[in-house]
């Protein structure tokens, strides 16, 4: 029976976090992980992982979930947070497996996996911030499902809002979680993520523009011109906003001069105001 503690490797390395990070950041991460699996080292560091070897993976067509997990880790960018999330993203599948309608399901495995990830990484000695980021990525790792069937703009906004500062890493994890050998399916998935990222950027730009305000408000424009409200005030405010977008913020006296020039050129078209 192996009596080595969870934070101690067979090589005598006392810090489990450093030991696992060394494996994940090696030049050949796939080879390093399989070596750690075969030697029993990974069972000391992350006892939940070997159970994935016995869990069939009907979705990704690997012989088991562990093979899929290591393939995902190998596809990730050189980012410790993303690689840790990839390592743990399916950790709860054995615990959540059920058989329904002749098939296998892993309902809510991301939520359960997030809790398991937090517990294991804390025991390994990772900093709290890293633990929170990785466990949150695991929790969010299934959020992209269903995008190809069509998401509303509100669903896209919710996805981006829930991911927050982890958005880039979440998308990197989702890209890496495609290990199919079907080139068309792989290309379709990458195209879907490209489309999601484009929509997020477009919606963010729309919201930024909607929140923009000219430096001078409508009341100040009316006071300066000595007029009441009307269509001309809205047009002047749009002109001032375009000036702000193209030239940045300008001194107020320069903006009032622009208002005077604009009003001199357009006043007649508004009749009596």
Model-assigned labels for residue ranges:
Residues 31-38, 46-52, 85-86, 97, ...:
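Short coil/turn segments at secondary-structure boundaries
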Residues 1-8, 180-273:
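Charged substrate- and nucleic-acid-binding regions of tRNA-handling and nucleotidyl-transfer enzymes
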Residues 51-54, 90, 133-141, 154-156, ...:
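A glycine-rich phosphate-binding loop feature that marks nucleotide/adenosyl-phosphate handling sites
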Residues 2-107:
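Acidic/His-rich, divalent-metal-binding segments that scaffold phosphate/diphosphate chemistry
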Residues 11-13, 24-27, 61-64, 108-115, ...:
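Short acidic alpha-helix initiation/capping motifs at coil-to-helix transition points
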Residues 15-19, 31-32, 68-71, 115-120, ...:
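A general alpha-helix detector
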């Amino acid at each position: 029976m192996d009596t080595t503690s969870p934070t101690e490797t067979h090589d005598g390395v006392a810090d489990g976090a450093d030991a696992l990070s060394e494996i994940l950041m090696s030049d050949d991460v796939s080879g390093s992980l399989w070596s750690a699996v075969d030697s029993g080292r990974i069972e000391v560091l992350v006892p939940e992982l070997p159970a994935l070897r016995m869990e069939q993976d009907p979705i990704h067509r690997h012989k088991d979930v562990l093979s899929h997990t290591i393939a995902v880790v190998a596809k990730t960018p050189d980012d410790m947070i993303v690689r840790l999330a990839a390592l743990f993203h399916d950790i709860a599948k054995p615990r959540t497996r059920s058989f329904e309608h002749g098939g296998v399901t892993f309902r809510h495995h991301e939520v359960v996996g997030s809790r398991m990830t937090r517990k294991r990484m804390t025991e390994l000695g990772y900093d709290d911030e890293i633990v929170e980021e990785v466990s949150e990525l695991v929790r969010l790792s299934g959020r992209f499902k269903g995008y190809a069937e069509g998401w509303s703009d509100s669903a896209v906004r919710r996805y981006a809002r829930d991911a927050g500062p982890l958005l880039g890493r979440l998308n990197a994890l989702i890209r890496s979680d495609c290990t199919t050998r079907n080139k068309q399916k792989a290309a379709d998935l990458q195209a879907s993520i490209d489309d999601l990222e484009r929509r997020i950027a477009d919606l963010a730009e729309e919201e930024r523009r909607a929140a923009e305000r000219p430096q001078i408000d409508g009341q100040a424009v009316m006071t300066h011109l000595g007029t009441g409200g009307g269509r001309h005030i809205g047009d002047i405010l749009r002109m001032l906003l375009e000036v702000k977008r193209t030239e940045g913020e300008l001194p107020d006296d320069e903006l009032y001069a622009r208002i005077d020039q604009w009003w001199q050129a357009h006043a007649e078209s508004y009749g009596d105001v």
